[in-house]
């Protein structure tokens, strides 16, 4: 009996069982840069806000139908954001105007809609670059380059 236990205990480490991952990630990046993925409609009225939200819902429905379980939602593009911030302005892709309030929180909406579908939503942030000189100028006084000059270095 002792010999059997000894042999089994010596062989046990060499027996391997292929384990499945606890959670498989099937993710898609959803970009807002230049409206490549979303949004197509500018949020300038109650109707266009509803349309902008419907566009996102449609994308999420298609991702869910394709068996995706994670969305990497772009929340910061080039020095502007897709959520209310006291540091940086709203992205102009939302309303057509840099800093223009779209009338809702796009990130909170994306999270809520992902969760309704049993999907995870991860914030994807582009940290650098802030953009070319023309883009940075379009951000106005709320730009990080204006407010925090000591941390920004122009590319030459």
Predicted regions and their residues:
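Bacterial N-terminal signal peptides
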Residues: 4-13
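N-terminal signal peptide c-region/cleavage motif recognized by signal peptidases
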Residues: 13-14, 22
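Extracellular/periplasmic catalytic domains that process cell-envelope and extracellular macromolecules
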Residues: 19-24, 64-65, 115-116, 144-145
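Active-site-adjacent "subsite" loops/lids of carbohydrate-active enzymes
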Residues: 23, 31, 35-54, 112, ...
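Hydrophobic faces of well-ordered beta-strands that scaffold small-molecule active sites
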Residues: 26-30, 71-73, 121-123
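A mature extracytoplasmic/lumenal domain signature
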Residues: 32-34, 75-77, 87, 125-127
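Aromatic- and glycine-enriched glycan-recognition loops and surfaces
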Residues: 45-66, 93-117
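Aromatic-lined carbohydrate-binding/catalytic grooves of carbohydrate-active enzymes
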Residues: 66-102
């Amino acid at each position: 009996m002792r010999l059997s236990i000894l042999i089994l205990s010596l062989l046990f480490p060499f027996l391997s069982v292929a384990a499945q991952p606890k959670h498989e990630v099937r993710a898609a990046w959803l970009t807002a840069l230049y409206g490549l993925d979303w949004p197509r409609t500018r949020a300038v009225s109650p109707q266009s806000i509803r349309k902008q939200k419907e566009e996102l819902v449609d994308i999420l429905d298609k991702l869910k139908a394709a068996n995706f379980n994670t969305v990497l939602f772009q929340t910061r593009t080039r020095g502007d954001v897709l959520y209310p911030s006291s540091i940086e302005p709203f992205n102009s892709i939302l309303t057509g105007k840099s800093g223009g309030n779209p009338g809702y929180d796009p990130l909170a909406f994306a999270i809520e809609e992902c969760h309704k579908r049993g999907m995870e939503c991860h914030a994807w942030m582009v940290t650098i670059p802030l953009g070319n000189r023309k883009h940075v100028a379009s951000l106005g006084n709320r730009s990080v380059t204006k407010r925090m000059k000591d941390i920004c270095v122009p590319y030459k």
